[in-house]
Amino acid sequence: MSSISTESSSNLSLLENGGGGSDKPTAETSRRVRRTVSASSLIRKRSDLKLISRVRWEFMRRILTNLQEVLLGTKLFILFPAVPLAVVAHRYDCPRAWVFALSLLGLTPLAERISFLTEQIAFHTGPTVGGLMNATCGNATEMIIAILAVGQRKMRIVKLSLLGSILSNLLFVLGTSLFLGGISNLRKHQSFDPRQGDMNSMLLYLALLCQTLPMIMRFTMEAEEYDGSDVVVLSRASSFVMLIAYLAFLIFHLFSSHLSPPPPPLPQREDVHDDDVSDKEEEGAVIGMWSAIFWLIIMTLLVALLSDYLVSTIQDAADSWGLSVGFIGIILLPIVGNAAEHAGAVIFAFRNKLDITLGIALGSATQIALFVVPVTVLVAWTMGIEMDLNFNLLETACFALSILVTSLVLQDGTSNYMKGLVLLLCYVVIAACFFVSNSPSSKLLF
């Protein structure tokens, strides 16, 4: 459930432009921040403030404006009722499968709003601070779910949800975008900067290495010699390596803009025009910085609450629906939770803006693999819980093949609907694999 911003690669274009920490968003800051066109901007709704402007008291007008922009300023506002319904269902002991479903639906608009609020803060703090916020908090929902699952010692949920988000971005999001983008631009040549794909593929291969070695170590040890401690130590060391790589990735974009892939081009007026996104909204922030920080805290707390419900009821939902936990964690959680982000990537592909699409899909996958996963391992360490990077053979094989297929598809810097179809078919095969897999390992035994 990654945040709905154009993460890592495209968010980091904020870093390339420098930026200050002015209290008020200037026109130059707004221009530079807008260079990272986010998927959330595509599902924004035009706010009609005519009625609010008639309110006599200034303080009340500000409150109503904030409520309208934050709660009603998205096309996903129709899903907000799922948040209180999930709380009520949990409070009054409704079927736990319903609690899971309502929590999953409620997380979709909350994740999008976290992205929106981070974007608003970036307008006020400047592109450097805003870019760092997006680079570290771009997948806040996934991290919250993972940490809560660690607290409940449901390590399989942690690994499935994180791996599912990576596979979803590499195959489903990117595949859908390339397929539909290719069909809608049959008479146009779709191209992108291949350096962006090369950079992210290289980092994903590093993450794959760090996940594969603990699994290999586990298989090479004799059963009577294995106690798990060596694998855990290796996993923690590998986590530090991945974090160093991610930090180097940020620095590379910050200080080596002449070597790194250029930021996605700002779409022309005819490309970014949308009936629900006004020119005024594109000029700068629509709420104040402290209001954005306040709402960001509220949304994060709600995400934590629903994530707790989600983790505690996933096994009950799997039993009720006749599905394996593996299928729910790998397939359902990422698709439903990242629906807004997926839609944004597809829309950019429709508009022949594949660099932005790659920034969303590859950037999110890289951020989860190199930042969220190692942070989760280290947080578990601080909690006195042993978590390793052994994702098991089937999951690791799916990860490796997904990276390989994606890197092959993107190596020449061109796109067509056939490439997207291949990625989608790969995702279908993986989904079918986890759908039919109902082995004891697919149950939560701890």
From Swiss-Prot:
<feature type="topological domain" description="Cytoplasmic">
    <location>
        <begin position="184"/>
        <end position="196"/>
    </location>
</feature>
<dbReference type="InterPro" id="IPR004713">
    <property type="entry name" value="CaH_exchang"/>
</dbReference>
<dbReference type="Pfam" id="PF01699">
    <property type="entry name" value="Na_Ca_ex"/>
</dbReference>
<keyword id="KW-0406">Ion transport</keyword>
<feature type="region of interest" description="Cation selection">
    <location>
        <begin position="138"/>
        <end position="173"/>
    </location>
</feature>
<feature type="transmembrane region" description="Helical">
    <location>
        <begin position="197"/>
        <end position="217"/>
    </location>
</feature>
<dbReference type="InterPro" id="IPR004837">
    <property type="entry name" value="NaCa_Exmemb"/>
</dbReference>
<feature type="transmembrane region" description="Helical">
    <location>
        <begin position="360"/>
        <end position="380"/>
    </location>
</feature>
<dbReference type="GO" id="GO:0009705">
    <property type="term" value="C:plant-type vacuole membrane"/>
</dbReference>
<dbReference type="InterPro" id="IPR044880">
    <property type="entry name" value="NCX_ion-bd_dom_sf"/>
</dbReference>
<feature type="region of interest" description="Disordered">
    <location>
        <begin position="1"/>
        <end position="33"/>
    </location>
</feature>
<feature type="transmembrane region" description="Helical">
    <location>
        <begin position="97"/>
        <end position="117"/>
    </location>
</feature>
<feature type="transmembrane region" description="Helical">
    <location>
        <begin position="70"/>
        <end position="90"/>
    </location>
</feature>
<feature type="transmembrane region" description="Helical">
    <location>
        <begin position="320"/>
        <end position="340"/>
    </location>
</feature>
<dbReference type="GO" id="GO:0015368">
    <property type="term" value="F:calcium:monoatomic cation antiporter activity"/>
</dbReference>
<feature type="topological domain" description="Cytoplasmic">
    <location>
        <begin position="260"/>
        <end position="285"/>
    </location>
</feature>
<comment type="function">
    <text>Vacuolar cation/proton exchanger (CAX). Translocates Ca(2+) and other metal ions into vacuoles using the proton gradient formed by H(+)-ATPase and H(+)-pyrophosphatase. Cation selectivity transport in tobacco root tonoplast vesicles is Cd(2+)&gt;Zn(2+)&gt;&gt;Ca(2+)&gt;&gt;&gt;Mn(2+).</text>
</comment>
<dbReference type="InterPro" id="IPR004798">
    <property type="entry name" value="CAX-like"/>
</dbReference>
<feature type="topological domain" description="Extracellular">
    <location>
        <begin position="218"/>
        <end position="238"/>
    </location>
</feature>
<keyword id="KW-0926">Vacuole</keyword>
<feature type="topological domain" description="Cytoplasmic">
    <location>
        <begin position="410"/>
        <end position="416"/>
    </location>
</feature>
<keyword id="KW-0472">Membrane</keyword>
<feature type="transmembrane region" description="Helical">
    <location>
        <begin position="163"/>
        <end position="183"/>
    </location>
</feature>
<feature type="compositionally biased region" description="Low complexity">
    <location>
        <begin position="1"/>
        <end position="16"/>
    </location>
</feature>
<feature type="topological domain" description="Cytoplasmic">
    <location>
        <begin position="118"/>
        <end position="128"/>
    </location>
</feature>
<keyword id="KW-0050">Antiport</keyword>
<feature type="topological domain" description="Cytoplasmic">
    <location>
        <begin position="341"/>
        <end position="359"/>
    </location>
</feature>
<feature type="topological domain" description="Extracellular">
    <location>
        <begin position="91"/>
        <end position="96"/>
    </location>
</feature>
<feature type="topological domain" description="Cytoplasmic">
    <location>
        <begin position="1"/>
        <end position="69"/>
    </location>
</feature>
<keyword id="KW-0813">Transport</keyword>
<comment type="similarity">
    <text>Belongs to the Ca(2+):cation antiporter (CaCA) (TC 2.A.19) family. Cation/proton exchanger (CAX) subfamily.</text>
</comment>
<feature type="transmembrane region" description="Helical">
    <location>
        <begin position="417"/>
        <end position="437"/>
    </location>
</feature>
<feature type="transmembrane region" description="Helical">
    <location>
        <begin position="389"/>
        <end position="409"/>
    </location>
</feature>
<feature type="topological domain" description="Extracellular">
    <location>
        <begin position="381"/>
        <end position="388"/>
    </location>
</feature>
<dbReference type="GO" id="GO:0009733">
    <property type="term" value="P:response to auxin"/>
</dbReference>
<keyword id="KW-0109">Calcium transport</keyword>
<protein>
    <recommendedName>
        <fullName>Vacuolar cation/proton exchanger 4</fullName>
    </recommendedName>
</protein>
<feature type="region of interest" description="Cation selection">
    <location>
        <begin position="337"/>
        <end position="372"/>
    </location>
</feature>
<feature type="topological domain" description="Extracellular">
    <location>
        <begin position="150"/>
        <end position="162"/>
    </location>
</feature>
<keyword id="KW-0812">Transmembrane</keyword>
<feature type="transmembrane region" description="Helical">
    <location>
        <begin position="239"/>
        <end position="259"/>
    </location>
</feature>
<feature type="topological domain" description="Extracellular">
    <location>
        <begin position="438"/>
        <end position="446"/>
    </location>
</feature>
